[in-house]
Regions:
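Hydrophobic (often cysteine-bearing) scaffold residues that line and stabilize catalytic clefts
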Residues: 17, 21, 72, 124, ...
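SAM-dependent nucleic-acid methyltransferase catalytic core
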Residues: 125-228
Length: 229
């Protein structure tokens, strides 16, 4: 049965291919508990962007997951945490202020990267490098830095020459890439609204690793339920 409740906004903070419906996780947990299985820890060994991670911690349970894709684990970690909005606002204000005065280093190796030059024009390379640099400069708390890096990651496609509606890498010769700063402001504010939906709930904890499950040494069973795809 399809759930009556809509998916939380947190599931939409970053584009990611082949996401499955969030309710599969909660249905699996409920089904296991109906069959007298005590579910304290849920795992997703190909955790992707963290659909299972978010729904698990929302249920007040512990999550363990891994993926070899660093972008996937960044999104999953961001989704499965709750942030103080006042602290987000403070860091965000400082990022914007620093961005407006920061000068990029034209000797940075990024300018000699052929693939970067292929996807981005020089103005967008300048502004994206500036934004990424000030995120690392201003946000000294790694927990919050991941939130702002996740927002940065999600604007890259719209600020590039990549065909907007295509999952496969494809140049759109007619595309006008979006402005970096306005795109980032919109993205962060959207993510803050998503975070506010979760602010007063008691969440479980998530343990997310960037690794291949085949490389993980498991001495004994440590999870009660695996939900993966």
């Amino acid at each position: 049965n399809m759930p009556a409740e809509r998916e939380r906004r947190m599931h939409s903070i970053h584009a990611y291919p082949a996401k499955f419906p969030a309710f599969i996780t909660t249905k699996a947990i409920h089904k296991a508990e109906e069959n007298n299985i005590s579910v304290k820890t849920v795992a997703d060994i190909f955790c992707g962007c963290g659909t299972v991670a978010f729904e698990t911690v929302r249920s007040g349970k512990h999550f363990w997951g891994c993926d070899i894709n660093p972008v996937a684990t960044l999104i999953a970690e961001t989704k499965s945490n709750v942030y103080q909005d006042g602290q987000l606002q403070d860091f965000f204000d400082r990022i914007i202020a620093a961005y407006k005065t920061y000068s990029v280093d034209k000797s940075n190796h990024i300018y000699s990267n052929e693939r970067i030059q292929y996807w981005f024009d020089e103005e967008h390379i300048d502004n994206l490098l500036k934004l990424r640099s000030v995120i690392y400069l201003v946000v000294d708390d790694e927990f919050y830095r991941k939130f702002f890096l996740c927002a940065f990651s999600n604007i890259l496609k719209s600020c590039s020459r990549w065909l907007t509606k295509s999952i496969k890498p494809q140049i759109d010769p007619k595309k006008q890439p979006k402005d970096v700063l306005s795109s980032y402001i919109y993205q962060v504010n959207m993510m803050r609204r998503a975070n506010m939906e979760n602010i007063n709930e008691k969440y479980g904890e998530a343990d997310i690793k960037r690794t291949n499950i085949l490389d993980v040494n498991i001495d004994k069973p440590f999870v009660d339920l695996i939900v993966t795809s």
